């Protein structure tokens, strides 16, 4: 039944096609997580589908899960089958003769130590689980394969790794390659005595040749990353290739696939897709990263080959899903799976108004919120306005043709939507030897009283009064400036990986008041909060007034439209293994704060908050599991479920003319909740909820 396809996404849930990839349906929208790390179909009864939650590639934007799920009816209904504390699951293998036996490779969370890692097994269809392979609390199962001719033979790769907000370590004594010949009862670890590299190992990717299961490939991260091969079923190993062509960034990729009909044809899945026709001794590029016309996005994470027709393959990458029927000569991109990961969202005042936002690894875009055409909004109506990992977009309020767009590590451009022209305006320090620190998602904002005045955050606050052409520094270093957290050049562990994703001691939030000139709120990634009442001439550190964990990540600050002394602050600490939601409110310029959201109100950590600019009792909240609304000034919260999935809600904006709530999600693209005036009426008159019917003008 190859026309039935299931696709798991990093933070956009599970999708199903019954038409070979022509049409798609989201089938995992009501669960408590939208992050999918593994999918397995019971081939003897394809209506039985297993899903492991929590993506398995632990970059800085990683999403976690809450266990393993099972469906008996092709995804119409789901049952949680346990492993709730596993956080991230990367592989599921169903026994081909006895489907009650299922193996799960739990990679676990990189953000903290926990024992729910390693390889798990159930013998009763998920009712009970046994951990059958484990080394330590920082090591998880990065890969797991089964011999197709002998289901009692398993090969597992354990990976010792840890992530801090400011550093990543891959490799340690908990890593290793393990083989079991008795269905996981006992395991033997392979070592340098068997031909594997000496010393600590990092991430390992495994592949068994289906046509010749005695041939096994292992892509091993060590002091020198290399591809190893066994021709005796895993007893002895030999290094066959250590060139760059085998792959890169092992913490993020490390997947291999072998052609089911040809044991010498190997696909290495990484930034590119490289293929070997000689058993790994050499590779050629099947899909380069850029400069080709096949329309396939680079950065690949999932690869499937039809077991009977190796020309039919599917590729999952940072840009979506692609399908080929001719072994990579041509590709079809599935344009109807809306799983974009927005960091920020914005609107303009055109008619129809446009929605703007920056996406993880897919640039920054602009497109209409609605259209008067019968076909509705088409993908072609949207325009990429700048390249890179997209973050904040600030459309010019006076002329929507122009605006400012940010990308990773403090890059920013002036864009022209008509011509496509981009002009870089990244701030620099007047003393060239002074190094600026920009977060992966650096702070950027526009002054609400002077549209040509911009603010940008490094460790300093930068201000421009000429639209970004020139910049002045208007603050001291507002971070802790802790040197122990500024060693990003050493980040990566066995393989250096210094892309800027771990930049730390940086400014994340610059929030000017919309109703009082020169009032600025500042938040940093290392938990510092500052306030200026005079446009940056003087700064107050108000951090200790906030009852939050020391060093918590300041994700957002919202200055009130009703009271200049009032602001909302969103902090989260999941990067230090604390998922508690934290939203605070001050009404006295930061002298005191009250917590208005905690774990009794919502599920998961908080990401964004918005008080309605018209009705002060109406609040909206975005968390790791969705959208919440309060009608009573944040006293009580209700999850919004009608027409809206479980997903990360990263940012919120209100279009004032049309009273629309625009929602930027990290996994399900952007939504518009049309005309919230009825919600304002309910917040202003709570008794309306007791009326059986209420009409609104």
Model-derived regions: residue spans:
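Beta-propeller blade termini and top-face loops
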Residues: 1-697
């Amino acid at each position: 039944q190859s026309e039935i396809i299931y696709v798991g996404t990093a933070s956009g849930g599970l999708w199903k096609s019954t038409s070979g990839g022509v049409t798609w349906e989201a089938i995992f929208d009501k669960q408590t997580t939208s992050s999918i790390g593994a999918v397995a179909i019971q081939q003897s009864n394809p209506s039985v589908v297993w899903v492991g939650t929590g993506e398995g590639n632990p970059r800085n934007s990683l999403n976690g899960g809450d266990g393993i799920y099972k469906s008996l009816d092709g995804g119409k209904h789901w049952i949680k089958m346990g492993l709730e504390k596993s956080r991230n699951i990367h592989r599921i293998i169903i026994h081909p003769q006895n489907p009650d036996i299922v193996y799960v490779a739990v990679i676990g969370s990189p953000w903290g130590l926990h024992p729910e890692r390693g390889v798990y097994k159930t013998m009763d269809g998920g009712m009970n689980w046994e951990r059958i392979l484990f080394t330590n609390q920082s090591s998880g199962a990065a890969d797991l394969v089964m011999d197709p001719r002998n289901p009692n033979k398993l090969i597992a790769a354990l990976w010792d790794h840890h992530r801090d907000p400011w550093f990543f370590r891959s490799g340690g004594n908990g890593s290793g390659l393990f083989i079991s010949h008795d269905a996981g009862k006992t395991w033997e670890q392979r070592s340098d005595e068997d031909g594997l590299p000496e010393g600590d190992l990092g991430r390992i990717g495994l592949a068994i040749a289906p046509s010749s299961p005695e041939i096994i490939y292992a892509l091993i991260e060590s002091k020198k990353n290399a591809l190893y091969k066994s021709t005796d079923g895993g007893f002895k190993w030999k290094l066959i290739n250590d060139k760059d062509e085998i792959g890169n960034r092992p913490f993020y990729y490390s997947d291999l696939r072998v052609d089911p009909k040809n044991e010498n044809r190997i696909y290495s899945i990484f930034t590119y897709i490289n293929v070997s026709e000689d058993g790994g001794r050499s590779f050629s590029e099947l899909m380069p990263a850029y400069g080709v016309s096949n329309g396939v996005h680079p950065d690949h994470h999932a690869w499937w080959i039809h077991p009977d027709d190796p020309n039919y393959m599917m590729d999952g990458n940072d840009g979506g899903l692609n399908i080929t029927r001719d072994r990579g000569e041509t590709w079809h991109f599935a344009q109807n799976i809306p799983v974009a990961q927005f960091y920020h969202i914005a609107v303009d005042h055109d008619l129809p108004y446009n929605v703007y936002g920056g996406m993880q690894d897919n640039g920054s875009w602009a497109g209409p919120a609605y259209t008067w055409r019968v076909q509705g909004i088409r993908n072609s109506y949207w325009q990429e306005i700048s390249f890179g990992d997209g973050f904040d977009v600030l459309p010019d309020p006076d002329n929507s043709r122009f605006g400012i767009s940010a990308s990773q590590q403090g890059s920013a451009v002036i864009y022209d939507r008509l011509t496509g022209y981009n002009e870089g305006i990244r701030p620099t320090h007047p003393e060239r030897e002074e190094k600026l620190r920009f977060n992966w998602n650096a702070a950027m904002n526009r002054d609400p009283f002077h549209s040509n005045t911009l603010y940008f955050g490094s460790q300093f606050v930068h201000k421009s009064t000429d639209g970004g052409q020139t910049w002045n520094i208007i603050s001291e270093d507002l971070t802790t400036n802790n040197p122990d957290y500024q060693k990003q050049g050493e980040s990566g562990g066995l393989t250096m990986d210094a892309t800027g994703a771990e930049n730390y001691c940086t400014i994340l939030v610059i929030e000017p008041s919309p109703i009082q000139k020169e009032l600025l709120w500042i938040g940093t990634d290392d938990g510092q909060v500052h306030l200026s009442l005079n446009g940056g001439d003087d700064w107050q550190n108000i951090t200790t007034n906030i009852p939050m964990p020391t060093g918590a990540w300041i994700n957002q600050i919202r200055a009130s439209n009703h009271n200049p002394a009032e602001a909302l602050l969103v902090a989260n600490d999941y990067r230090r293994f604390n998922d508690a939601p934290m939203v605070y409110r001050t009404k006295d310029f930061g002298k005191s704060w009250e917590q208005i959201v905690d774990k009794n109100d919502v599920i998961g950590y908080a990401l964004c908050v918005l008080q309605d600019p018209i009705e002060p009792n109406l609040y909206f909240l975005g968390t790791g599991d969705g959208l919440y609304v309060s009608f009573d000034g944040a006293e009580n919260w209700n999850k919004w479920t009608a027409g809206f999935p479980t997903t990360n809600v990263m940012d919120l904006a209100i279009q004032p003319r049309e009273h629309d709530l625009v929602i930027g999600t990290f996994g399900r693209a952007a939504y518009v909740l049309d005309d919230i005036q009825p919600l304002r009426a309910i917040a202003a008159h709570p008794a309306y909820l007791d009326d059986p019917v209420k009409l609104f003008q």
